[in-house]
A protein has these predicted regions:
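A short, hydrophobic beta-strand element within the central beta-sheet of small alpha/beta folds
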Residues: 77-82
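Active-site residues of response regulator receiver
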Residues: 7, 56-57
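Two-component/phosphorelay signaling modules centered on CheY-like receiver
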Residues: 10-35
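The feature encodes the CheY-like receiver
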Residues: 60
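Acidic catalytic/metal-coordinating carboxylates
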Residues: 39, 63-67
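Acidic, metal-coordinating helix/loop segments flanking the phosphotransfer/catalytic sites
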Residues: 34-52
């Protein structure tokens, strides 16, 4: 499983990664691969598997709503948090 985080604020990315890692650790689960992006364009250019995606709504260039819609077109099973 891969969890992707897309936010133009790297501090938000770091904090969300810590929360996710802490959740898996506290539940004695193997943490999945965490991948971060600072733009919607770079996330959409990534062709690898996308299981769960956390998106920032307001980003320069492509906003999170647009990116989420594009992800759903490519994979209707992707889970998206905005």
């Amino acid at each position: 499983m891969r969890i992707l985080i897309c936010d133009d604020d790297t501090l938000i990315i770091e904090q969300l990664q810590k929360y996710i890692e802490s959740y898996f650790e506290s539940n004695h689960l193997k943490c999945p691969e965490l991948v971060s992006f600072t733009s919607g364009e770079s996330l959409l250019a990534e062709k690898s598997e996308k299981d769960i995606v956390f998106l920032d709504i307001e980003m320069p260039g492509m906003n999170g709503i647009y990116v989420g819609n594009e992800l759903k077109k490519a994979n209707k099973n992707v889970i998206i948090f905005v």
